[in-house]
Amino acid sequence: MAKPSHSSYVLQQLNNQREWGFLCDCCIAIDDIYFQAHKAVLAACSSYFRMFFMNHQHSTAQLNLSNMKISAECFDLILQFMYLGKIMTAPSSFEQFKVAMNYLQLYNVPDCLEDIQDADCSSSKCSSSASSRQSSKMIFGVRMYEDTVARNGNEANRWCAEPSSTVNTPHHREPEEESLQLANFPEPLFDVCKKSSVSKLSTPKERVSRRFGRSFTCDSCGFGFSCEKLLDEHVLTCTNRHSYQNTTRAYHRIVDIRDGKDSNIKAELAEKDSSKTFSAQPDKYREDANQAPDDSASTTGSRKSTVEAGIAGEEKSRATETKRIIIKMEPEDIPADDMKDFNIIKVTEKDCNESTDNDELEDEPEEPFYRYYVEEDVGIKKSGRKTLKPRMSISVDERGGLENMRPPNNTSPIQEDAENASCELCGLTITEEDLSSHYLAKHIENICACGKCGQILVKGRQLQEHAQRCGEPQDLTMNGLGNADEKMDMEENPDEQSEIRDMFVEMLDDFRDNHYQINSIQKKQLFKHSACPFRCPNCGQRFETENLVVEHMSSCLDQDMFKGAIMEENERDHRRKHFCNLCGKGFYQRCHLREHYTVHTKEKQFVCQTCGKQFLRERQLRLHNDMHKGMARYVCSICDQGNFRKHDHVRHMISHLSGGETICQVCFQIFPNNEQLEQHMDVHLYTCGICGAKFNLRKDMRSHYNAKHLKRT
């Protein structure tokens, strides 16, 4: 159980560090007065500083508040309140002080002065900026407090050359002995913080009040610590070596040793202290103040012998420390044994840059739903591996056509091996009929379709070379789809072939956007149709595998209803007045065509004015600027965590789900079961006003209306 004084102790140490300037990473200027502070403390107490540090992460070393209606006196008291939870002196005007706190958007603004004013402002337990002029000894943010002892006016301090402040304890005791005279000790000892001796207290309350009086000092760098554990952790990484190390290491513990009743006890204690290692027990660091000697001073000869014994013991301890090397290891987050059932996919820098095109599509009005599913790859010779993957939508510039489902080459399908084909991207050798599914499932982000002929090409140089010779006669048959008779019919009718290919491409596009791909095992069902998760977008027929639905969609082109949709697609092409001279894709506005050219040229013409990073698309730049400003587009309603991309927000929301719960991918509403989610999804569908048919995308509903209900003249 944590001690009740821990929070007060941490605040005290932070305030001491602020006064000393130790680890301060921010400077606040008000007129000609400068205040040092820690960003973490300011951001934890003030919403104003939190947002400022988020928006100006690279230029917050110094902050000027002179143009604000905040006086230096008020800000000094605000810093006291941030670091201590109270103020040491009353402000001249509490209303002005409260206005300044509200302006800085402090999370806790007091209603009255009595709530934050210290009951005993003269107490030295909590020092402030106003009391920083006290001559107490403080090393790197740790203030050394000592017992209140009766001294003569000219008596030297036991630890420091300057007098230090004391801690007021409930019960004052008369000292039982005089302090050790330091006249014969070297002068460098006065500059090093020594381990203060702690008296054995009778009550726990006294131990709490005396807690600030104990410190542990590093022999190498002189840093002071409040407990032995912090000192042990610091020693493992301490690399500082000062010139006074060899001359003072044997002294810093001997100073706290009082003269024993006999010289043998004193020499024994000195030798024991000098041979301590940093892994010793805590009781070896403590000295009993009640072990006071009867004599106030010892002879110079006995002191010298003690020092020599201490130096000899220290050399042995240094040799022991050199041989004993402690390496602190952190446990790995994901052990290798736990990862054996997961597919680990290495994403290159090129893939990350190209995948940003897909990430930005979530801002489009007709955005497809992101489907999260459990995929289980079950092979004959290998065990099943389960991975959770989001089904990403296809880029807008890739919607001009979809795969003819074969790697691009100059040979005709007749000359190729009818049984096997190799993937152009990963080199995997698979059958021709499975090649289409392989490209859809594995490489959808690295392929692009020609807008004129529909041939699938790998992004990059192949796409540009093909676009230059796309007007030349070439074999345009679709590989792996339909039978040989269907291919012959398509070759005899090139115009109909082009129309059918375009609509087939659009259907595959919508198929990827609008349907779930989930595990076929019954216990992992996410929706009631998970046994046959693949559905033809034209006739609604469901299939168990992706290969079956792709083959069915090629034969589904012959239906009259689908031909009507082809006519509707041709009729709306006349509205696209701006066409790309490389791939032939049409756009409604010239600015969209200009942005589309970056797909071919790979020219990143949109530059961030803050950091200089370049982007292909303007919406990528807008999203990047939002990250600079700290403006999260999606905020979790449970824990208030912000995300900039929708699919990242969905992944985060999934972490809040309990067993059996599911989440709507559109409005992020959580439902206890899949049946309620199915009923809720009707709210997000587009309904035909005439026949009541429902569609996921608005353009699908419009196509349905034009093909079914619009009277043609």
Swiss-Prot record:
Region of interest (Disordered), ranges: 270-319
ZnF locations on chain (C2H2-type): 216-242, 448-470, 578-600, 606-628, 634-656, 662-684, 686-709
GO molecular function terms noted in the UniProt entry: DNA binding; K63-linked polyubiquitin modification-dependent protein binding; protein heterodimerization activity; protein homodimerization activity; zinc ion binding
GO cellular component: nuclear body; nuclear membrane; nucleoplasm; nucleus
Annotated keywords: Differentiation, DNA-binding, Immunity, Innate immunity, Isopeptide bond, Metal-binding, Nucleus, Phosphoprotein, Repeat, Transcription, Transcription regulation, Ubl conjugation, Zinc, Zinc-finger
Stored CDD domains: BTB_POZ_ZBTB1
Every BTB domain range: 24-91
Residues modified as Phosphothreonine: T356
ZnF region ranges: UBZ-type: 533-558
Compartment annotation: Nucleus; Nucleus, Nucleoplasm
Disruption phenotype: Thymus of embryos show a small number of T-cell progenitors that are unable to progress through thymic differentiation. Adult mice show vestigial thymus and lymph nodes and a reduced spleen size. In the periphery and in the spleen, display an absence of mature T-cells, a reduced number of NK cells, but a normal number of mature B-cells.
Pfam families, A to Z: BTB
Transmembrane segments: none
GO terms for biological process, alphabetical: B cell differentiation; cellular response to UV; chromatin remodeling; DNA damage response; DNA repair; innate immune response; mRNA transcription by RNA polymerase II; negative regulation of transcription by RNA polymerase II
PTM info: Sumoylated with SUMO2 at Lys-328 and to a lesser extent at Lys-266. Sumoylation inhibits its transcriptional repression activity and regulates its subcellular localization.
Cross-link (Glycyl lysine isopeptide (Lys-Gly) (interchain with G-Cter in SUMO2)): 3, 200, 205, 261, 266, 276, 284, 304, 316, 328, 340, 346, 381, 528, 563
Assembly, per entry: Homodimer. Homodimer. Interacts (via BTB domain) with TRIM28 (unphosphorylated or phosphorylated form).
Domain notes: Both the BTB domain and C2H2-type motifs are necessary for transcriptional repression activity. The BTB domain is also necessary for oligomerization and efficient sumoylation. The hydrophobic cluster preceding Lys-328 enhanced sumoylation efficiency.
PANTHER family cross-referenced by the UniProt entry: ZINC FINGER AND BTB DOMAIN CONTAINING 1, ZINC FINGER PROTEIN
Its job: Acts as a transcriptional repressor. Represses cAMP-responsive element (CRE)-mediated transcriptional activation. In addition, has a role in translesion DNA synthesis. Requires for UV-inducible RAD18 loading, PCNA monoubiquitination, POLH recruitment to replication factories and efficient translesion DNA synthesis. Plays a key role in the transcriptional regulation of T lymphocyte development.
Protein's recorded name: Zinc finger and BTB domain-containing protein 1
Organism expressing this protein natively: Mus musculus (Mouse)
Lineage: Eukaryota, Metazoa, Chordata, Craniata, Vertebrata
Gene it is expressed from: Zbtb1
